[in-house]
């Protein structure tokens, strides 16, 4: 089921990219939904086979450190004089334009490409650990403490991301490891807030709108690709 769901998300991404037009010559291979599908699928398979949270954290660390080293030290063979953190010289961009060519978002790179999916798997695993933390039942571990725990983890990841940015900048297009940490910081802080307000304090009179969006996020994302709303 994990693999099927992952490839379904990739297929939906191809639909958003114009698959139904049957113009395959320059159809973009990667997409936001393909990135989500690949990262979630790989993350879920890792999560299913690596059960202890410390081991999962170690996997995340290896993914982020490995990608950070590769993206900052390895220079594209076709542009040896370029900086490793530019589109021309970055190894992730080189792999995308070499393997996918005109099927990339732009001629020289794709922001949701192959190698940059590696740190995105780390993003997916961090989300899975957050879900495990919320579901964890332990004596004395109240909802309030869970929210505080997520806040603390978020602050720590934010500091790590900031310090990491001195080595590799916070860059969404490259999905840099520092970007992963900073985004995880914001996400955990927001999750802690909504978890505390909705699940702990039970203030739910206002949340229907957000529940609808959250339960139909993929459909909402795809809708503007088929219907023009005039803005």
Regions found by a protein language model. Give the residues of each.
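Alpha-helical transmembrane segments and their immediate juxtamembrane cytosolic regions
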Residues: 1-231
